Amino acid sequence: MEQKTGQRRRSDLFFCLAVFAAMLVFFTVLHPIPIMDEDDVIYTVLSRKAIPIPGAWNPSRMMPEVLSALCGNIAGLCTALKLGRFINCQVAVLGIMLALFITGYAYSLLRLLEKRFEAGRFAALSLVILFLELHFLIFRTEYSRNLYMFHTYDQCCVFYYTMPALLCCALVMQFMANPEWTPRLTGKQPLRESMLVLVLYFAVFSNLFGSAVLASYVLCRTIRDGLRAKKTGTGFQTFLKDEAVWLTVLLLWMIAAILESTGGRAGGKPQAVAAGAVGLPEGLRQAVGVLFQMFGKTALLFRLLMLAAVLAAAAVYLAEKDAGKKKALRQTLGGILAWSVPNGLFLILLCAVVSPGYAGRPEAMFTLLSAGMLLMILAFAALVRRFPRTGLLLPVLLVFVFSMTNTRFLTFADSNPLDLDGHLAMAVENEIYESIIRAAEAGETEVTVRVPLSGEETNWPHDGNVGNPIAQFFLKYGIIDHEITVRIQPSEEFNREFHIPLPDAG
């Protein structure tokens, strides 16, 4: 038994290292994500208190701003230690952090498959790989520059949307793997319990687009436990004691939602929300329309796999003679639907209030789309458990999905506001920041830095607010040795030099 446990742990470690390495290469070599716009800069150099702040621009989005600043500070330290240029270090640190989140997300599904579906090692690992492949296949409808589940508008959105969604989805899958386990803070396992508190704290105070799935799951779990307690005659005080952690998560999440309504938009630019501009009913109509448009842009193979999963679940349910296994399958898949529906409804409402266009962004709808893919994978897991020989087809399916996802062109879009190739975006930002460093080394106290001409009124994403915060940040880490004032000059010549398309004259 101990030998099997040791083998499983080594297998887990190897699998996690493989996923981490693959994602690290993807986000540092293939599709790097450098900072570019004002939001990226602000939250990279920001020093946010790790508590909710009523009235701030982002009152309850504590986790994104803490992690974004951590990424920036580590990158600044690496630059000061001469390990590389600042943008290169920032891309590397971000790649490591994002790869860690995705690895934890994949590992959570692995635990769920093995504990709830008794999946064999080979089948479980194959299904997790398929799950990750689906994140890249889902919007692969063109030969190049396709969206995918980890794509974002800019670097800032990785911290604000993708990471919170990954963390909350991972937590839900971990809790699903142990449906009868209720977390209790007894103090008997201080390290494990303190880590649970920290992770839940970060998850709740992250972003409503991500944390809603955790709140929906906890709500459904609490209702289920309440009905059981009523059926068994458990006292109300005992119920409250048993559910203390779940109820605290719900309470804190509601506080986060209320606090968020008191804040402004990121970047310090207050804007009218959609519900106030067009009315809530119209905002809802637009959000639903945008969401269905996004569904319509999914790849044909993805839809066929979804249909195959539905047929697989139906076949397993009809073929299963054991009433207990039927009930377990019904409870598992039905349970996902139970918390997916309130999560989806809340996301649509949130989009209607903030901006209906968010309903078409993969990073904002991540938890909803992830739930659909989770249902698909669990249906296939049930099929393999009921008909073991179908598992022999999993390697063929993995190779086929990969071949239908990858193209000989630049398959996926890069995450930056100018839609530049990631390597070109890095070169652009390196030139901008190295210009500041060169001027400081020459003893200048003022410098005018050329940036790409975008055609926007403020020249977004390179407006007048991106230079001075970075210069102050460089001074903090000794990358420059004195204060320097940075002025931004949009330049057509810069565009030509880096082969960036010039904006239309109109």
Q: Predicted regions span which residues?
A:
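Transmembrane catalytic cores of multi-pass membrane glycosyltransferases
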Residues: 25-96, 208-363
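Intrinsically disordered, polar/acidic, low-complexity terminal segments
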Residues: 2-66, 75, 79-127, 388-506
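Signature aromatic-anchored transmembrane alpha helix within multi-pass, membrane-resident enzymes
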Residues: 188-193, 250-251, 324, 328-340, ...
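Transmembrane alpha-helical segments
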Residues: 101-113, 167-180, 215-224, 310-314, ...
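Membrane-interface micro-motifs in multi-pass membrane enzymes
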Residues: 123-178, 348-379
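Membrane-interface helix-boundary motifs at transmembrane edges
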Residues: 4-8, 109-124, 179-189, 226-241, ...
